Design a protein with these regions (language model features):
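A domain-start/cap signature at the N-terminus of enzymes
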Residues: 1-45, 54, 99, 114, ...
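Gly/Ser-rich "nucleophile elbow"/oxyanion-hole loop immediately N-terminal to the catalytic nucleophile
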Residues: 37-42, 129-170
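Short, solvent-exposed loop/turn and secondary-structure capping segments
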Residues: 42-44, 57-65, 127-132, 179, ...
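The conserved beta1-alpha1 loop
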Residues: 45, 50-52, 194
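Active-site machinery of serine-nucleophile hydrolases
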Residues: 50-145
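Short, proline-enriched alpha-helix->beta-strand connector loops that line the catalytic pocket
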Residues: 110-113, 214-220, 244
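Primarily recognizes the serine-hydrolase "nucleophile elbow" in alpha/beta-hydrolase
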Residues: 160-207, 211-214
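C-terminal catalytic histidine-bearing segment of alpha/beta-hydrolase fold enzymes
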Residues: 219-223, 227-284
Length: 284
């Protein structure tokens, strides 16, 4: 841009809070970011965005606001609405080719917006639960049976399966993968960012993915980074998906496994991918 400064759209969204006194995982809360100016006629795809373990152990209130406050997701939304993106929007974790490709794509097809729903995620990586893929299933029941019905009732959300996506980072990426595959009748897209999968889990997750595909076409994306401690396990999962002929996207981008990644490429990549695939379009 001429002045070298990024444009920030301060009015990009409004917040809607959802509180639950009880449910499959006990009390819960979620914050939804709803595109501002929705006039009631336009309906938006829904993305359930899940935070990492740091927010899980800080409690329900902090967890529900993890993507909003700790990961600065609102800034990512605002910048996607006001391209071109700059290197600083990715906290420096982007190469020239990908930055150019994303900006060219945004110039051709502007970001239209999602209802991003951010619930608290229980600690499914505790010493008791980390060896069990099923530890996330009660949380998945909450999302599908309690949270999504309220989102549809109280926001301008689309309700069809193909317009529902789930994604998350680290612990949240693990949860998104397990929950999305378990409820593939409700989700059309599953994304993960630096998912906290273990080295011995690729085969079991691939088996769940094959079963999930019986519900119809499913967009799956595995994103890791060059300094992600889970990169090796995610590469194994990518190989297991390839061997099982499970269609998916696999992306390795620059960045560490920390808040800077979440606030930079993590949020941007997540939002842009779901903005496209939940409308049945190519991601870039």
């Amino acid at each position: 841009m001429a002045d070298g400064k990024a444009r920030i759209d301060e009015g990009a969204f409004t917040e809607v809070a959802f509180d639950f006194a009880a449910g499959p995982v006990g009390p819960e809360k979620a914050i939804a970011l709803v595109p501002r100016g929705a006039d009631g006629a336009e309906r938006y795809p829904v993305l359930v965005a899940l935070h990492g373990r740091g927010e899980s152990v800080r409690g329900i209130e902090a967890g529900a606001r993890g993507w909003v406050d700790d990961y600065d997701l609102g800034r990512a939304i605002s910048r996607l609405r006001s391209p071109p993106l700059m290197r600083e929007d990715f906290r420096g974790f982007v190469d020239d080719a990908r930055l150019a490709r994303i900006n060219a794509s945004l110039a051709a097809r502007p970001f239209r917006g999602l209802i991003v729903v951010c619930p608290w995620v229980p600690d499914i990586l505790s010493s008791r639960d980390r060896s069990s893929l099923d530890a996330a299933l009660p949380f998945g029941d909450f999302v599908v049976d309690h949270l999504l019905p309220r989102v549809v009732a109280e926001t301008p959300a689309r309700d069809e399966r193909t317009a529902n996506g789930i994604d998350g980072v680290s612990l949240g990426g693990r949860a998104a993968l397990i929950v999305g595959l378990a409820h593939a009748d409700r989700f059309g897209a599953i994304g993960t960012l630096q998912a906290a999968v273990q080295d011995n889990e690729a085969g079991a997750i691939a088996a769940r993915a094959r079963a999930a595909l019986a519900n119809g076409a499913l967009r799956i994306r595995l994103v890791t980074s060059d300094r992600d401690p889970f990169a090796g396990a995610i590469a194994q999962l990518h190989s297991a998906f390839d061997e099982g002929r499970i269609d998916h996207e696999y992306l390795v981008i620059p960045g560490p496994h920390d808040y800077a990644f979440n606030r930079g490429p993590g949020g941007i990549e997540m939002l842009l991918w779901h903005d496209r695939v939940l409308r049945g379009e190519p991601p870039l």
